[in-house]
Amino acid sequence: MTFSVKTIPDMLVEAYGNQTEVARRLKCSRGTVRKYVDDKDGKMHAIVNDVLMVHRGWSERDALLRKN
């Protein structure tokens, strides 16, 4: 099985900068595309086989575990 992993900036290059087209391909809002447009390293999102996956943040419990 082959996996395709991209980021929103990668898709914007393919769509010639058209945020609306990227949003249509990902079945999300243009606002969501704008939210991740600067995440070039994919630390907060990834697109795996044309499905957008996002990191929703750290919980208080996770923050406490990371401190220890």
From Swiss-Prot:
Superkingdom field: Viruses
Organism: Escherichia phage lambda (Bacteriophage lambda)
Full protein name: Protein ninH
Family: Belongs to the ninH family.
